[in-house]
Amino acid sequence: MIQMQSHLRVADNSGARRVMCIKVLGGAGRRYASVGDIIVVSIKEAIPTGRVKKGDVRKAVVVRVAKDINRADGSTIRFDSNAAVLINNNGEPIGTRVFGPVPRELRAKNQVKIANMAPEVL
């Protein structure tokens, strides 16, 4: 569960390393975001040669959450940390690679391009 002021790692090669959620998109008063949801983030830490700079405000898709994700078959999955992938205003990833595993719930939330770039889909 990601909410405002939550810090996330960045799981792509866009140049950002850490981001902070400043808004959860998808309805007035929506408080939490989970895997596949789009959030607005502020970049808190970035590498000097990246496509984004510290202080930029961008959109991102949540790809990993530390909170349990319940599946229809009764199983659950959880990750060690919260992570996101930066996207542009058209919904396309800024980076060209995604690091680490992503859950298959991304495909159900129309984030197929990110799921295809990931090395492993759980």
From Swiss-Prot:
**UniProt-recorded Gene Ontology molecular function terms:** large ribosomal subunit rRNA binding; structural constituent of ribosome
Top-rank lineage group of the source organism: Bacteria
Record's SMART domains? Ribosomal_L14
Please provide the record's keywords in A-Z order.
Answer: Ribonucleoprotein, Ribosomal protein, RNA-binding, rRNA-binding
Q: Which GO terms describe its biological process?
A: translation
Q: Which GO terms describe its cellular component?
A: cytosolic large ribosomal subunit
Keyword RNA-binding applies? yes
Gene3D superfamilies attached here? Answer: Ribosomal protein L14
Q: Does this entry carry the keyword Metal-binding?
A: no
Q: Into which family does the record put it?
A: Belongs to the universal ribosomal protein uL14 family.
Q: HAMAP family annotated for this entry?
A: Ribosomal_uL14 (MF_01367)
Functional note: Binds to 23S rRNA. Forms part of two intersubunit bridges in the 70S ribosome.
- Subunit structure, per the record? Part of the 50S ribosomal subunit. Forms a cluster with proteins L3 and L19. In the 70S ribosome, L14 and L19 interact and together make contacts with the 16S rRNA in bridges B5 and B8.
Name under which the protein is recorded:
Large ribosomal subunit protein uL14
Which species does the entry assign this protein to?
Answer: Hyphomonas neptunium (strain ATCC 15444)
